[in-house]
UniProtKB/Swiss-Prot annotation:
This enzyme's EC code(s): 2.4.2.17
Any one biological process term the GO annotation gives: L-histidine biosynthetic process
Reactions it catalyzes: 1-(5-phospho-beta-D-ribosyl)-ATP + diphosphate = 5-phospho-alpha-D-ribose 1-diphosphate + ATP
Gene: hisG
Superkingdom per UniProt: Bacteria
Signal peptide (from-to): none
Listed SUPFAM superfamilies: GlnB-like (SSF54913), Periplasmic binding protein-like II (SSF53850)
Name of the protein described by the UniProt record: ATP phosphoribosyltransferase
Subunit field text: Equilibrium between an active dimeric form, an inactive hexameric form and higher aggregates. Interconversion between the various forms is largely reversible and is influenced by the natural substrates and inhibitors of the enzyme.
The organism's taxonomic lineage, starting at the top: Bacteria, Bacillati, Actinomycetota, Actinomycetes, Mycobacteriales
Record text on activity regulation: Feedback inhibited by histidine. Also inhibited by AMP.
Length: 284
């Protein structure tokens, strides 16, 4: 039986649960449940703190886990990333009081508060910067105001929380994070390979369905070359003749984030009846 870790709370919990449910796996009926057995798919799910998931997977106690890339980097666990899941995006940045043009070199000799001490120490060592890293488990933004730290290193989304505490992010991100599906490093050739690959394929199919749309449209045959350049699809677009020999029907997958621009381009070359449809799953 495969053993899979899922975040038990926080911003990653609900999207992770939804993806697994869409992939055909049993969901928990009570938020207090710490384990759920799915006998149909021969999988047991464990609902754990996101920060602990990489450690459990890296130790070999669990086969897979869903957590943030930033948490994986900080854990130092021997895991590998199988899939990026397309939600929970953020950057891990340094931040310090606003009103000054900070650089990472300014961190030398400072006290840096963070909930990710290993990640910060590794980055500082890479840059040859000596500083004191102070571990806090949350609300690190207030540490500067309270005089506990001179700067912080934390996950930055919109930046609103930093602004509320008169802080500004600076330097290159230590880590660009999002939710990821991880497994223990060095699992090639082990038992349950088929079951493992099936879980990855199912989850990947759901994620792909969230990131792509199916585009159907009618196109003048004279504009076919331009149209297929705009919508090349994954392997190749589907092209079918219409009753009017001067027109063809084209179908292709397109990235959801680009669909409006693509439709504009198609309309500009004379395409008609351009229809974008949601897809739930995709195997490829």
């Amino acid at each position: 039986m495969l053993r899979v870790a899922v975040p038990n709370k926080g911003a990653l919990s609900e999207p992770a649960t939804e993806i697994l449910a869409e992939a055909g796996y049993r969901r928990r009926t009570d938020s207090k449940d710490l384990t759920v057995i799915d006998p149909v798919n021969n999988v047991e799910f464990f609902f754990l703190r996101p920060k602990d998931i990489a450690i459990y997977v890296g130790s070999g106690e669990l086969d897979f886990g869903i957590t943030g890339r930033d948490l994986v980097c900080d854990s130092g666990a021997q895991v590998r990333e199988r899939l990026a899941l397309g939600f929970g995006s953020s950057s891990f940045r340094y931040a310090a009081p606003a009103g000054r043009n900070w650089t990472t070199a300014d961190l030398a000799g400072m006290r840096i508060a963070t909930a990710y001490p290993n990640l910060v120490r590794k980055d500082l060592a890479t840059k040859g910067i000596e500083a004191t890293v102070i571990r806090l488990d949350g609300a690190v933004e207030i540490s500067v105001q309270l005089g506990v730290a001179d700067a912080i290193a934390d996950v930055v989304g919109s930046g609103r929380t930093l602004s509320q505490h008169d802080l500004v992010a600076f330097g290159e991100p230590l880590c660009d994070s999002e939710a990821v599906l991880i497994e223990r490093a060095g699992t090639d050739g082990q038992d349950q390979t088929e079951a493992r690959d099936q879980l990855v394929a199912r989850v990947q199919g759901v994620v792909f369905g969230q990131q792509y749309l199916m585009l159907d449209y009618d196109c003048p045959r004279s504009a076919l070359k331009k149209a297929t350049a705009i919508t090349p699809g994954l392997e190749s677009p589907t092209i079918a003749p219409l009753a009017d020999p001067d027109w063809v029907a084209i179908r292709a997958l397109v990235p959801r984030r680009d669909v409006n621009g693509i439709m504009d381009e198609l309309a500009a070359i004379g395409a008609k009846a351009i229809l974008a449809s949601d897809i739930r799953f995709c195997r490829f």
